[in-house]
C-alpha cells in the first residue's frame, strides 16, 4: 500500500471515535437547563392568631427569635432562626379579613437579577428587584391562584447577614427546612407552573407525582397538595433520629402524632410540621 494511503487509513481510524462521540451527542435529547440555580428555601411566612403563643411554641422547638420588625411599636413580623440562611417568619393578625395560616414561601438566590430576567423571559411577571426592609434584595411574583411567591438575595449588612452565627439554639429539633407544602385547588395548573415555567424538576427520589425539587444543589422540595379549607402550612423539617426527636419533644411538653406513618406536630394555629429522616450536610454552627 502506498505511504499516502496508509497515512489516510490511520487518520480515518483515529477519527472514528470522534465521529462516534459526535453522533452519540447529537442523538441525545437537548438538555433542559431550567431555571438558574437557587440556594433553596429562605423562609416560610405564616399569619398567626397570637404572636406570643406562636413564638413560644417555636422557641420550644429550639428556634430563637433573631430579630423583629415593627410599625410604630406594633409588631409586624418576627424572624425565628432555623439556620444561618433559613427562617420562619410569623406575622400577627391585625385585620379580621386576614387569613390565618400559610402566607408565602421565599426562595434564596445568589443571582437575583438573573433569576428575575429568566422568569420575565418565560412569560412570568416578576416585580423589579428592590431592597427590602431587612436589607436584602427582593422581588415577588404571583403564582397559581394569585398566591404570592418571594425571592431574595442576602446582602452584606442586612439583618440576616449581621446575625450569621448568632441565635442558633443548641436544642433545635432540626437544622434545616427541607420542604414546604403548598395547597392548590387546581393541581394540574400548579404543577405546570412550577415545572413548566419556574423550571422546577420532579423530585427523583420521590414517588409523589406532585413533589418538585428546587433548582440548585439544596435537594429541598415543594409539594403541591389539594386545597384545604383551613389554609394551614405544611413544613417539612429534617431530623437525624425520629425516635430521639419524639422523646425530646415529649420532654418539652410537645406531643407528636403519626399521619400516613409520618410523625407530625401542630403549632397553636394548626399548621403541620412534618419530621423526616434526612441526611443534613450542615452542622449545628450553621
Where are these regions (language model features)?
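Bacterial N-terminal signal peptides
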Residues: 10-24
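Residues embedded in well-ordered secondary-structure elements
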Residues: 16, 33-35, 69, 79, ...
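Core segments of cupin and vicinal oxygen chelate
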Residues: 36-39, 45-87, 121, 129, ...
Amino acid at each position: 500500500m502506498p505511504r499516502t494511503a496508509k497515512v489516510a487509513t490511520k487518520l480515518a481510524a483515529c477519527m472514528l471515535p470522534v465521529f462516534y462521540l459526535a453522533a452519540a451527542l447529537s442523538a441525545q435529547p437537548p438538555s433542559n437547563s431550567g431555571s438558574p440555580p437557587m440556594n433553596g428555601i429562605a423562609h416560610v411566612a405564616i399569619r398567626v392568631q397570637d404572636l406570643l403563643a406562636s413564638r413560644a411554641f417555636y422557641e420550644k422547638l429550639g428556634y430563637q427569635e433573631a430579630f423583629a420588625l415593627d410599625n410604630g411599636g406594633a409588631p409586624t413580623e418576627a424572624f425565628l432562626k432555623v439556620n444561618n440562611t433559613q427562617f420562619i417568619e410569623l406575622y400577627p393578625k391585625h385585620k379580621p379579613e386576614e387569613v390565618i395560616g400559610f402566607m408565602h414561601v421565599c426562595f434564596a438566590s445568589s443571582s437575583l437579577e438573573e433569576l428575575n430576567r429568566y422568569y420575565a423571559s418565560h412569560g412570568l411577571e416578576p416585580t423589579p428587584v428592590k431592597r427590602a426592609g431587612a436589607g436584602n434584595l427582593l422581588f415577588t411574583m404571583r403564582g397559581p391562584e394569585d398566591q404570592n411567591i418571594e425571592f431574595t438575595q442576602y446582602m452584606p449588612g442586612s439583618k440576616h447577614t449581621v446575625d450569621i452565627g448568632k441565635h442558633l439554639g443548641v436544642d433545635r429539633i432540626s437544622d434545616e427546612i427541607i420542604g414546604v407544602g403548598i395547597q392548590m385547588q387546581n393541581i394540574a395548573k400548579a404543577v405546570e407552573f412550577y415545572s413548566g415555567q419556574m423550571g422546577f424538576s420532579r423530585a427523583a427520589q420521590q414517588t409523589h407525582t406532585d413533589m418538585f425539587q428546587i433548582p440548585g444543589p439544596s435537594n429541598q422540595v415543594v409539594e403541591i397538595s389539594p386545597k384545604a379549607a383551613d389554609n394551614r402550612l405544611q413544613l417539612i423539617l429534617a431530623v437525624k433520629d425520629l425516635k430521639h426527636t419524639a422523646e425530646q419533644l415529649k420532654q418539652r411538653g410537645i406531643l407528636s402524632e403519626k399521619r400516613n406513618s409520618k410523625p407530625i406536630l401542630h403549632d397553636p394555629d394548626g399548621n403541620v410540621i412534618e419530621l423526616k429522616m434526612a441526611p443534613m450536610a450542615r452542622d449545628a454552627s450553621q
